[in-house]
Amino acid sequence: MRQILEDSQLRRAMQLGVILIVGSCLISQLMMQLGGGARDERVDLTGQAPEGFEDEGFIFEDGFPPFISSAGAFMPERIVFNFGLFTGGVLMILLSFEVFHRTKPEGTKRNVANVTALITGVIIGFSMVQLVGHPFNTSLIMHIFWA
């Protein structure tokens, strides 16, 4: 089996991915909750709602809801949120390929599982990258799709 990273490097890369994603979500959410200002003003996203769904909870009277994605709306927390999710998503894609190459099995059943794990890892990593490109306050439907 071909491997790019040593075992200790792979372990550190996986730890880094978890720290990046979880840490950036927690820090950016804390920044958003304490930021005040426009974050606490009424948010109306009905202009982005699909036709016929305009009355389905797209208005937040008390400001941005405490969703993880709310942290991607305003600076400076947006920088933390975007950096963590984008970098974590790219790292997840790369680690998916590393694990795929390390675990290439001989049997057909295990090969299907290995390919499935690779595909899902790449999709999840790509989805995290796309969340950065589609903030929920400006691109709601695409954000929901990628989330």
Placement of each model-derived feature along the sequence:
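Early transmembrane hairpin module of multi-pass membrane proteins
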Residues: R2, L10, M14-A147
